[in-house]
Amino acid sequence: MSAATESAQEAQWRKWRSVADLYHAFFTGLILTVVTRRGTADAAEFVFRVFRRQQQERFLPGLKKLGLDGLPPAVAAAQYHYLSNWIGGVHVQYVYENDRKAWIRYPPPRWIWKGTAICGVPGEVSRAMLRGWHANNGVALGDLRLGFVCTKQSVDGQDGLEGYYCEYDHPLELDQRLVFARHLEAPPFDPNTAPALPVDSWPKPRLEKAYRNYAMEYVKTAAPVIVQVFGPEDASYLLHLTGKLIGMQYFDEVAQALGGSRGRATEFAEIGRASCRERV
């Protein structure tokens, strides 16, 4: 590859990452908008439905894409969270104990609650994320013995979101698929023993595109979900307000990455069009 081609490719990837950051900020901001305008209970319901829909649409296909579908259920679920989140730029750790118990940990700084946003997220909203996705992986795999034990929540002041998948000796009832055990702690993380993506099937260009798409998928899921939960009129207000706030806060940052600058409405519109082009 020539130096010019490599430089152009790096510039393209910077644009993709800027778009990813914008979508990331919008998704986090949307949750905070619902918390502050609708309250904790409504925000928890919204987050639950977003993550349940994501889980139903992406978990099983993702297992196959990552080559994890032949692993024991607890190991497959934990490795899925490790690899899929790693691709999206999330700080994440994985620890294998045995074929029926595997840990996953999201240490600070938390990706989803970036920066000071973490101070505005109630514990109930974080639990809704786990109920929506982690608690339902056993159901998706057809193994009702698989549950998730949460040992830490960063929004509660603990040093990360942490827990383990456990395959029990009996089928679990609905309220047993997510339980809390705050007295436990994950074993130390060893990156040398963690799973890794095969380089030949996951080259740099594919990883960069997946990084961009990771944040975009949350917004693509959240938009229709918020309409279903709150109705089109209230959803329109929440989406518009969040978009305006995030747009004002992130305009300079995104414009710089996309080769634009601060200006009047025409310049703002051009940055919007440039952002749309980088989503393709």
Where are the regions a protein language model picked out?
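N-terminal accessory segment detector
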Residues: M1-W103, R110-A128, V139, D143-G160, ...
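Elongated alpha-helical scaffolds
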Residues: M129-W133
